[in-house]
Every structure is written in C-alpha cells, then in structure tokens.
C-alpha cells in the first residue's frame, strides 16, 4: 500500500518533468489547502506504512510555537525539559529506541517506482550530489528562494528516503516553520552518527559503515547499550565529555540541547591529567592511576573489559593488624566493640583462699585424743579454747594477746610430747626388731647343730 504522501510525491516528479510551467501553477493552487495536511504528515514521518505506528500508545500533536532547540527544548516548538525527551511516543521522536524508519516499506511489499532501502538511499545521495535541472528551476515569487543551511549542509535520512521532504526545497513562509522543525531533528540525528546514537544507547553497531539510516533505534539498527539519560561509566570519562562535564550540564560537542555522546576515544593517560577533563563546573574527577605503574613511566592502562581496581570499588578497610576506631573506642574486625575485661570480675575469679589456711581450718592439727597428750596438755588446751570463745564477736587487743600466749604455750607442750612419744615408739620398734633378729639367729643356729652331728656320725665307718 502506497501512502498518500508517497503517491503525491511520485506524481509531482513525473508531472514536473513533462510540464514544468504548468506544474508550478498547479502546485501554487494546491499549496494552501494541503499545507496543514502535509505538515502533519511530515511531523508524523509517514506512519501509515509502519504497522508499529498503529500500536503506539499516544502521539503528542504538533503545536506551532517558538522554535527552540536550546537545552530546555526538543526542537519541535514544544518547550519541555531536556531531561524528559523520552516522554513522547516512539513514532514522534526519532531518537527514541522504539523508533523505526517509517519510509521503509513493510515486508513483502514491492512497487514499481520504489526500490529497496539501499537503492533508495543511494538514489537520494546521488540526487543531492547531482541535482536534476527540475530541482534547479527558478521558483515563483510566492515560494521560498533560500532554503535553510540545514538542507544544504546536513542531508537528513528523511531527505534520502522521502522524495517529498527532499525535493521541496522551495517553500512558502507558512511552510518554513514546520520544515525547520524536521530539520532540527534531522540535524540532531546527523550529529549523533559519529557517536553511535547515544540517545538510543548503542555501544556497538553491526554494520557501522553500510548503515545510512543512523536514526534507527535499538531494534532495526542492531544497537544496544545503557538506558538513556545515564552518564557513561567511570572508566570512560575523558576529553569527549565537553567543557561542562558529562551529561546535559552545558553545551558539549553536540551543541545546545543535543545528547552527550558515547565515549569513542581511549581513556586519558593517568600521568597527563590536568584541568582539561575537569571543566569549570566541577565534573567528576578523572580516575586515579592504575596499580601497575612502572618506575620510569605509566604502564599499560586499564582496558575497557577489565574491572576497575580495588581502590575504585568502594571504601577500603584498614590493615588487618590495626583495628578500626569507632565513636566509642576501638572496634574489632567484625564491627563490634572491643570490650576491656572488668577488673572486678578478674579479682573475683583470681582471688581465693590459700590452700594452707584452708587445710589448717579444716584439719585439726592438735588433736587431744592422741596417746602422747597428757593431763597438763589438756588443761592448757582448755584455757586456749576459753580465751578463743571470749574473742568471738568483738575485738579486744589485750585478750587477743593472752590468746596468743596461751596458744603458743599449748603448741609447744603438745609438740614436745609428740616428739618424745615418737622417739620412744621408734626405740621400742628398734628393740623389737633386734629381739626378733636374735630369736631368728638362735633358731637357725639350733637347727644347724643337729645336722652337723648327724653328718659327723655318717663319716665314721662301722666296725
């Protein structure tokens, strides 16, 4: 199915070649009633051929206004925020990832006058390089004689594939506003081509050299990358960020309102850092030098696929030997506080009664039931116990002195009696042992005497 716009274009080309003067008059007559219809078709970019355009949710209609291509506008006369450029539908914004070239015919469609997209694009290029004499005819007084510089210097992809938008170089003043809207968009798309279409988020292209339609998004253009309105990674900061830092902070190499490009250059040498990449507005600082630095100069820089060094991935932990210091004192490596031991608990654990004192209190060292205890020792023991009972419950130095004297007297008598008794016991034990030895010797001698007599008798011969 051929759209109404394409049919009108083909019919216009044929009629201009046959009857140039008559076509100029007919074109002037049809120019005013078809002005609004052609502007809407040029803004909508021929969405009738695209089956995907029918499924688009909503397309914001064109509203004529002040042409604004600054940082706050989108080039369509609608003054919106530059950061919200993706809020429109896919069929309206050429830089949207859902945008598909509407001039390309659907699959399986063939026309006699319309060739393949490659032939069509090459035909458009040849027409721009060698314009036909029909295009160089002198315009009428009602027509615009001076096309904008964007038509002469920046041929857009729409001009390559839309004969209507390419050949209508002589416009009336009423048509100039809608034409400049398309030219602003085309100029933005043309300037995006050296940077791999950053608004569509493309890091690579399948056919970068053979793709004349650079405005295609991430679906037909085989392009993919990070989502839009996101700054490039940290390792990709460098000279192409522009004088005002990355992102839409200021007019970068794309001009006002244009999206910032993808990083097409290698990262700068770490040793040659300076105020250039920083910018006057204070952009993010360049990455620090890599870990592998030679003594005489920088070593090989980090490649794009290599992960960043450890010092770029977050805050470093202190060395293992030095624990971190928290607001309440030193902390261990697990994040908890290092608690100092309580000295009171240590004293309670370490402190204990001596084993000697405990044995003296538990075991009575001076029992009275022993055989060496005499009546005198028992009387001294009773006096000592009496004074000890009087000292319990109150403190008396004089009574305590008497207790110590009585205690020393009892201990001396008790130990002397015990030693005397042990000596006597030892003497008796020795005497018993000696007596037992004598008895054994006597018994052994007595038993040996009869044996000797019997032996003597045995040596005497019988008569």
From Swiss-Prot:
GO terms for molecular function: DNA binding. Residues 87-142 are annotated as: 7 X approximate tandem repeats. Residues 1-13, 85-94, 194-214 have a biased composition (Polar residues). Residues 1-304, 426-463 are annotated as: Disordered. Residues 397-416 bind DNA. It is found in: Nucleus. Signal peptide: none annotated. Keywords: DNA-binding, Nucleus, Repeat. Residues 225-270, 282-291 have a biased composition (Pro residues). The keyword Isomerase does not apply. GO terms for biological process: dorsal/ventral pattern formation; follicle cell of egg chamber development; intracellular mRNA localization; negative regulation of translation; oogenesis; pole plasm mRNA localization; protein localization. InterPro entries: TRAMP_AT-DNA-binding. Residues 430-441 have a biased composition (Basic and acidic residues). Residues 14-50, 142-193 have a biased composition (Low complexity). GO terms for cellular component: nucleus. Sequence repeats lie at residues 87-94, 95-102, 103-110, 111-118, 119-126, 127-134, 135-142. Interacts (via N-terminus) with sqd; the interaction is direct and may be involved in localization of sqd to the oocyte during oogenesis. May be involved in localization of sqd to the oocyte during oogenesis. This is DNA-binding protein K10. It comes from Drosophila melanogaster (Fruit fly). The gene is fs(1)K10.
